[in-house]
Amino acid sequence: MNEAVTIRGKERYKSGVMEYKKMGYWEPDYEPKDTDVIALFRVTPQDGVDPIEAAAAVAGESSTATWTVVWTDRLTAAEKYRAKCYRVDPVPNSPGQYFAYIAYDLDLFEPGSISNLTASIIGNVFGFKPLKALRLEDMRLPIAYVKTFQGPATGIVVERERMDKFGRPLLGATVKPKLGLSGRNYGRVVYEALKGGLDFTKDDENINSQPFMHWRERFQYCMEAVNKAQAQTGEIKGTYLNVTAATMEDMYERAEYAKELGSIIVMIDLVIGYTAIQSMAKWARKNDMILHLHRAGHSTYTRQRNHGVSFRVIAKWMRLAGVDHIHAGTVVGKLEGDPATTKGYYDICREDFNPMTLENGLFFDQNWASLNKLMPVASGGIHAGQMHQLLHLLGEDVVLQFGGGTIGHPMGIAAGATANRVALEAMILARNEGRDYLHEGPEILAKAAQTCTPLKAALDTWKNVTFNYESTDTPDYAPTPSVSV
């Protein structure tokens, strides 16, 4: 099964149809070079299709192959440019599925272009008939390729300096309801939340420029709220102004206006596409702005474990592309997030080097070559009563966004913000004192609530509310003595 079967010489270029594994796309003896891009695919062949042939077909169709032999291959350095599948393993506990390791020569990709990379890696091959399903699980991006990208426009260190916030997670909230508010009422929500103790507020993914609130009106009221809250609290505040629009010209216009109004941060949605994301990241770097990315739409291709693209790959692409914030899961919230898998996402965002960690879904070592770090964002169904869990699981370099957990507070928005700020600072103090804050968390919160009525109301309202559903995306690996959960 693992023997090389490549046909070489004149027979290799004889007209007609030839199996991919015989065309040079299956090379089990190949040793990947340090400069190779490596992709790990989960391949589910159609019934009766040889898994080696299926994996070789993925290599071929994502690089130089077509359905028949073409003599023009001989006009190229074909041996170099063919992607090479060098390893195929059965997926543990998933009959009929296989992990295929495929190496691509670096010269196959345009430097610094996510769009070009994805056109090959997740292009036509995902519609290939011999496959029931195909998922891109992970990638190893060589240093030589990583260095062609800008990376996060601002980075965690500079963002903290700009915000003058150190030693704790940043706090935020998404304005609710996400649609329907007038500009004046929208700005009021922003002001109350920032005045109450949050660092950021945020537009939601689908608030752009609708009949009930034009984008310019929203920007004006929001920045009036930010400036007023800053003056009252003496702290630097921000609000993510969503500049997502129909064209790049519109997005640049909105971003420039946000900058003119004094905003330190703008926001875009993942659905604008890779080229637009990189374009906005370059604008943000040039204009000293923090760039927040809402991952709107990602679950259409990241959530199912047998088909699509893993979010760990999206996180890698977005760190290359140059965003400063990305929603990366909450573990304890309402949105998809297996704890081990989510830790892998956070490590991709925040570490200079990611070692292979199979239990967290990281299949390769990844060196980030001094690219800035990307701030992960946790949002969706979290509240003050989970603060000890959030700090333990996600660390301090994270934005914790309590939308409903702020705006849904029974005493009002400002009280909701205060409850979250007091809960966080109580937990940070306990951590700094060396206490076992994870296990003592409820006790720490209860004590803090004795002198903070808003926190007591939050704990009484949401109690132990959580969303314990089984994750659809968990790591697949075979446990060994050196790799155990």
Curated annotation (Swiss-Prot):
Residues reported to bind substrate: N124, T174, K178, R295, H327, S379
Membrane-spanning intervals of the chain: none
GO molecular function ontology, one term from the record: magnesium ion binding
Catalytic site: K176 (proton acceptor), H294 (proton acceptor)
Example GO BP: reductive pentose-phosphate cycle
PROSITE patterns (alphabetical): RUBISCO_LARGE
Coiled coil (UniProt feature): none
Top enzyme class: lyase
Residues annotated to bind Mg(2+): K202, D204, E205
UniProt miscellaneous comment: The basic functional RuBisCO is composed of a large chain homodimer in a 'head-to-tail' conformation. In form I RuBisCO this homodimer is arranged in a barrel-like tetramer with the small subunits forming a tetrameric 'cap' on each end of the 'barrel'.
Quaternary state and interactors: Heterohexadecamer of 8 large chains and 8 small chains.
Family statement: Belongs to the RuBisCO large chain family. Type I subfamily.
Protein name listed in UniProt: Ribulose bisphosphate carboxylase large chain
Originating species: Rhodopseudomonas palustris (strain TIE-1)
Gene that this sequence comes from: cbbL
